[in-house]
Amino acid sequence: MARYVFITGGVVSSLGKGIAAAALGALLQSRGYRVRLRKLDPYLNVDPGTMSPTQHGEVFVTDDGAETDLDLGHYERFTGRSATKTDNITTGRIYKNIIDKERRGDYLGATVQVIPHVTNEIKDFVTEGNDDYDFVICEIGGTVGDIEAMPFMEAIRQLGNDLPRGTAIYVHLTLMPYIPAAGELKTKPTQHSVKELQALGIHPDILLVRADREIPEAERRKLSLFCNVRPSAVIQALDVANIYDVPIAYHNEGLDSEVLAAFGIEPAPKPRLEQWEEVCNRIRTPEGEVTIAIVGKYTGLKDAYKSLIEALHHGGFANRVKVKLEWIESEVFEKEDPTPYLEKVNGILVPGGFGERGSEGKIMAAQFARERNVPYFGICFGMQMAVVEAARHLAGIENASSTEFGPTAEPVVGLMTEWVKGNELEKRSTKGDLGGTMRLGAYKAALKKDTKIAEIYGTTDISERHRHRYEVNVDYKDRLEECGLVFSGMSPDGVLPETVEYPDHPWFIGVQYHPELKSRPLDPHPLFASFVEAAVEQSRLV
């Protein structure tokens, strides 16, 4: 029977509930338990797929094609377990499900209300499909007191009574700010946050208290007294230098032991943390440093590239080097010469994106990398712009462009109108909805033998996650290959280009998919490990 850990947040947002949930999952896994992580998001969007990256951050795509919250990326990276569409739900999805049921007549004429219909829908989501797991860690988005989160708080309160006794606990993540004028940490914000949580009928079993310095024992006892939790259940969550330090830091503070004790699991199995210790050691003792330029269009919010950032660091772990990121807004190159920005970097990465803004700057970045023999990694839109650059400057197709930007005489990149998903044919048109209509999730690709990318993977059959609406036009394949750009990977039916590369370049690879979504600190993605390795070689030439 699964046990449930509900993680809530208080005082302020962005305290790191996702990291806390992921770290706890990793710690329980290290003790031999089977763990599942789920996220409840209070916003009214059906999913984050159509939300601005500068508001929401990255959209994390699962193997089964769900567009989800970026916290699911943390869950996957810390536990190694691939998430699914059933691991993330929003208020919008819940209400959509309920309205669909009401229209079908499933409620038999009943008045549909928040209680019980909305709360029941939430409870069903939380509890379904958990027979194969020992623990289900469920993160509730937002902050206690948010009006959007009220149905979720009520649902998890009810679950505390619905589930068998001793199978559900509540962990409250809160903040203990330091006031310089007073020279001390303050407990009052946490007290008020817990008071508000208790007013909703939820009594936390464990307090996970964020702070930027050691919490004195007297303050811990004070929190224990006023918040009605055991002294040992007041766990300090101090700031750390790297997120991959968090599992061991929380273990040293006793979080996983306290969770198991709250469930009455004593004595608990010993944790095996050797792999995490090795990762932390590589982070602390790098043998070198490389600089990677990320030429993007959402650089104002780094969370828009969360998985990408982590995957680059994983590549650094694999090569025992520190990866320094140089963020460049691609529009800058449309006004200024890119040379001063790029001549000292060891690698250039152009990530995914949407729309015409900044596209010419990305094309210029690809041209610089090709002509100067700088390692180049183009992902999704970054591959498309590299192909447009080749079409213009190598194949002589001056008007080469993408139909995403408007009508063009040379549609080197165009809207995908159909593709095979499983055994079915998916179709799209320019007049279709935006939400959930891209080529989403894991698709297989066939790599050409004796290419660099096949050598990197060590196989010619791969499966990677996609999120795109436009694709390189296969009709231009022969003309581009005559100019030296090799289409080194295609969809199994040979219709959709998946990867391109220049054989005579030190490292120039474009991929239509998003390999960053499958990279793990304990298992770096081979493309990122190889890209950083190429950057290390480049650093020796500069």
From Swiss-Prot:
What's the catalysed reaction? Answer: UTP + L-glutamine + ATP + H2O = CTP + L-glutamate + ADP + phosphate + 2 H(+); L-glutamine + H2O = L-glutamate + NH4(+); UTP + NH4(+) + ATP = CTP + ADP + phosphate + 2 H(+)
Residues covered by the Glutamine amidotransferase type-1 domain: 291-541
Task: Name the cystine pairs.
Answer: none
Pathway it acts in? Pyrimidine metabolism; CTP biosynthesis via de novo pathway; CTP from UDP: step 2/2
Any one cellular-component term (Gene Ontology): cytosol
**Residues engaged in binding CTP:** S13, D146, I147, E148, K186, T187, K188, P189, T190, Q191, K222
Record-annotated residues binding Mg(2+)?
D71, E139
Q: What is its EC number?
A: 6.3.4.2
- Extract the GO molecular function terms from the UniProt entry: ATP binding; CTP synthase activity; glutaminase activity; identical protein binding; metal ion binding
Q: Where is the active site?
A: C380 (nucleophile), H514, E516
Residues binding L-glutamine: G353, F381, G382, M383, Q384, E404, R469
Q: Where is this region: Amidoligase domain?
A: 1-265
CDD domains to which the protein is assigned, alphabetical: CTPS_N, GATase1_CTP_Synthase
Q: Which InterPro entries match?
A: Class_I_gatase-like, CTP_synthase, CTP_synthase_N, GATASE, GATase1_CTP_Synthase, P-loop_NTPase
Amino-acid positions noted as binding UTP in the UniProt annotation, renumbered to this chain = S13, K186, T187, K188, P189, T190, Q191, K222
Quaternary structure (record): Homotetramer.
Free-text function comment from the UniProt entry: Catalyzes the ATP-dependent amination of UTP to CTP with either L-glutamine or ammonia as the source of nitrogen. Regulates intracellular CTP levels through interactions with the four ribonucleotide triphosphates.
HAMAP family for this protein: PyrG (MF_01227)
To which protein family does this belong?
Belongs to the CTP synthase family.
Q: What name does this protein carry?
A: CTP synthase
